[in-house]
């Protein structure tokens, strides 16, 4: 009897965790845009992204050897 109830409890917890992850993923709509800052300085990138889109900016390199670009990620 204890094994059956323990199994049901485990399945219930698994199902609840899956539904909570799905709901969280639906609510977080994030968009990204490249801000033209050449060269990209992390502080300027963050400030520009905050003022323009109220988002998070970071310098990223799209290809090896290329100059970094400012990638701004914000709520859509």
Curated annotation (Swiss-Prot):
Query: Which Gene Ontology CC terms are recorded?
Result: extracellular region
Predominant location of this chain? secreted
**What subcellular locations does the record give?**
Secreted
Signal peptide annotation? 1-27
What residue ranges carry the coiled-coil annotation? none
InterPro entries in the record, alphabetically? DEFL (IPR010851)
Family matches, as Pfam families: SLR1-BP
Keyword Signal attached: yes
Output one GO BP term. Answer: defense response to fungus
- Keywords carried by this UniProt record: Antimicrobial, Disulfide bond, Fungicide, Plant defense, Secreted, Signal
Note the SS bond partners: 31-76, 40-59, 45-70, 49-72
The family classification in the record reads: Belongs to the DEFL family.
What name does the UniProt record give this protein? Defensin-like protein 155
Source species: Arabidopsis thaliana (Mouse-ear cress)
Give the taxonomic lineage as stored in the record: Eukaryota, Viridiplantae, Streptophyta, Embryophyta, Tracheophyta
């Amino acid at each position: 009897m204890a094994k059956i109830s323990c199994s049901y409890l485990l399945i219930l917890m698994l199902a609840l965790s899956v539904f909570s992850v799905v709901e969280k993923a639906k609510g977080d709509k994030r968009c990204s845009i490249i801000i033209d800052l050449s060269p990209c300085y992390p502080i300027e990138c963050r400030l520009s992204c905050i003022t323009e889109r109220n988002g998070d900016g970071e310098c990223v390199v799209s290809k090896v050897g290329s100059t970094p670009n400012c990638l701004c990620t914000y709520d859509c």
